[in-house]
Curated annotation (Swiss-Prot):
Name of the featured protein: Phosphatidylinositol 4-kinase gamma 8
Source species of the chain: Arabidopsis thaliana (Mouse-ear cress)
Gene encoding the protein: PI4KG8
Enzyme Commission number(s) of this protein: 2.7.1.67
This protein's UniProt keywords: ATP-binding, Kinase, Nucleotide-binding, Transferase
Region G-loop, residue ranges: 107-113
Ligand binding (ATP): P108, S109, G110, L111, G112, G113, A114, K129, Q210, R211, F212, V213, D278
Pfam families xref list: PI3_PI4_kinase
Region listing for Activation loop, in residue ranges: 276-302
Family to which this protein belongs: Belongs to the PI3/PI4-kinase family. Type II PI4K subfamily.
Catalytic activity annotation: a 1,2-diacyl-sn-glycero-3-phospho-(1D-myo-inositol) + ATP = a 1,2-diacyl-sn-glycero-3-phospho-(1D-myo-inositol 4-phosphate) + ADP + H(+)
The PI3K/PI4K catalytic domain, residue ranges: 101-397
UniProt function note: The phosphorylation of phosphatidylinositol (PI) to PI4P is the first committed step in the generation of phosphatidylinositol 4,5-bisphosphate (PIP2), a precursor of the second messenger inositol 1,4,5-trisphosphate (InsP3).
GO molecular function: 1-phosphatidylinositol 4-kinase activity; ATP binding
Length: 533
């Protein structure tokens, strides 16, 4: 069966051999703001005066938007990543499979809807994850749904329906395939039978599409001694940059190398490479608490190699942020600021000689005496933000400030007086809840036929008052990052451009002394570790 890719639209369709007249589409700009799908496509051949012809030997097909929408033929449109050759190749393979009649297979693992796509011969090609079937989403096929797109999800700093763009963002940020993230795209798939709560299948769905990676195990089935230091370091470097909130053993695939047998690999003899997948819970809207499964693995304590240090040194957080603005301009600016802060922290920490484990520790919150305390990175950001919004940059004594921070770190818990310390915080650190849903949520909600009146737009004042009555007052930030029983994060999206510049200046002034004056306290236990030791 012949399938072609149109260079203007990245759409695929079967050839129509009944017509030799080409119907051309006007060149419109794709709306990366996710995807305002109501954009009308112009069919220049609609005019009777249009006599544009190709060679009569070339079978032409209609790429008219109206014809595609009215046709029951499966097809795919690339919405994000279309400039990347590996993405276009992946989508071409998947398109050939689905127009040949391949059916998506729902995978039993995981909380969300993930579908395996195969060729006619049964070879695995890719895994598709519709955004309306994410964990907690209203169309979840595994009974864990109920929320509309745009509401806070499993992590309060990442909204339901926004995991797909983060999957693509992680791939775009993996320069030269350094961390081995599989090719990933964001696509609109039409007339393919995914799960739908209604009696009829939806005409189309937006989904992330990631190339399937053949593997022997996941990291949870082996002890960490089986993995190469290089693989652990490269995954860790990516996780730190994007502040991965969910790097557990199940989303690191294990590939044996050097033709090792299963017994050798499972006994921890030799080496195995890791492939990271599932990046839907990275780039949160605020500085949240990450989870790094590798934090206590011995490989993470090994110093970085010269190649790794050179790669880290060459990272440009501002160019990375601009890349995501270009490819995914619907991603929140606050998430891009998290990327910038974490990348700067990684670069400075690596240059100061810290290992991956030490860097991860300083980004991770600790639990002491049943209470969760702020991470070193959060403390730094809170102080830098307070300095920026108050405009007292020039008068700050950075050395004395960091001495106070070190004293707080020794205690392990931050207990402040509600009536004194909290009132001294600048008003801008206590900003209200979002009064509207970001544009991506609105567009996707419309796409999935979610009534706008179901979007989250109010805040439970009773919950807020209860939080204020608690004796343990934690770092103030944007309330969208607050779960009822979770610690708040540091929110950067409420700062103006000038304040953001002042924040970065203050942050970079505080950072060297913070890294120099703090020492690793050794590995600390992490709940949920699934690897053998």
């Amino acid at each position: 069966m012949a399938v072609a890719l149109d260079p203007l639209t990245d759409r695929f369709s079967q050839f129509s051999r009944s017509s030799q007249r080409c119907r051309l589409q006007s060149l419109t700009n794709l709306d990366f703001n996710f995807l305002g799908f109501n954009t009308k496509q112009t069919n220049l051949s609609a005019s009777s005066h249009s006599l544009n012809n190709r060679s009569v030997s070339t079978p032409c097909f209609s790429i008219s938007g109206s014809n595609l929408d009215g046709s029951a033929t499966p097809h795919i449109e690339i919405l994000g990543g279309q400039r990347v050759p590996t993405v276009r190749s992946l989508v071409a393979e998947v398109t050939i499979a689905i127009v040949s009649g391949a059916q998506p297979l729902l995978l039993p693992s995981g909380l969300g809807g993930a579908y395996l796509l195969q060729t006619e011969k049964g070879n695995n090609i890719a895994v598709a994850k519709p955004v309306d079937e994410e964990p907690l989403a209203f169309n979840n096929p595994k009974g864990s749904g109920g929320l509309t797109l745009g509401q806070p999800g499993m992590k309060r700093s990442i909204r339901v329906g926004e995991s797909g763009i983060r999957e693509l963002a992680a791939y775009l940020l993996d320069h030269q395939g350094f961390s081995s993230v599989p090719p990933t795209a964001l696509v609109r798939i039409s007339h393919v039978p995914f799960h739908d709560r209604g009696s009829d299948h939806a005409a189309y769905k937006v989904a992330s599409l990631q190339r399937f990676v053949g593997h022997d195990f996941d990291a949870g089935e082996l002890g960490p001694g089986s993995f190469t230091v290089v693989s652990v370091h490269r995954i860790g470097i990516l996780d730190v940059r994007v502040l991965n909130l969910d790097r557990h053993a199940g989303n690191m695939l294990v590939k044996k190398i050097h033709d090792q047998d299963e017994t050798t690999c499972s006994n921890g003899v030799g080496a195995a490479e890791l492939v990271p997948i599932d990046h839907g819970l990275c780039l949160p809207e605020c500085l949240d608490d990450p989870y790094f499964e590798w934090l206590n693995w011995p490989q993470a304590s090994v110093p970085f190699t010269d190649i790794e240090l050179q790669y880290i040194s060459n990272l440009d957080p501002f160019k990375d942020a601009e890349l995501l603005r270009t490819e995914l301009d619907s991603i929140q600016e606050s998430s891009l600021r998290v990327l910038i802060v974490c990348t700067i922290f990684l670069k400075e920490a690596a240059a100061a000689g810290l290992s991956l484990a030490e860097i991860g520790e300083k980004m991770t919150r600790d639990i002491c005496r049943g209470e969760e305390s702020s991470s070193v990175l959060e403390i730094l950001c809170n102080k830098a933000k307070a300095s920026a919004v108050s405009g007292s940059d020039d008068d700050d004594d950075y050395s004395s400030e960091w001495n106070e921070v070190e004293a707080e770190l020794e205690c392990g818990i931050f207990q402040f007086d509600d009536e004194v310390e909290c009132k001294e915080l600048p008003d801008m650190l206590q900003v209200p809840i979002f009064t509207r849903v970001p544009s991506i949520a609105a567009n996707l909600s419309a796409l999935m036929r979610c009534p706008p009146n179901q979007w989250i737009s109010t805040y439970d004042t009773n919950i807020e008052e209860e939080r204020r009555d608690r004796s343990i007052v934690r770092s103030k930030s944007h309330p969208i990052c607050v779960n009822y029983d979770e610690k708040e994060g540091v929110y950067f999206g409420d700062m103006s451009g000038d304040e953001w510049e002042m924040f970065l200046h203050s942050f970079q002034m505080l950072l060297p002394e913070a890294l120099e004056g703090s020492t690793s306290k050794g590995p600390k236990p992490r709940f949920g570790s699934s690897c053998k030791f």
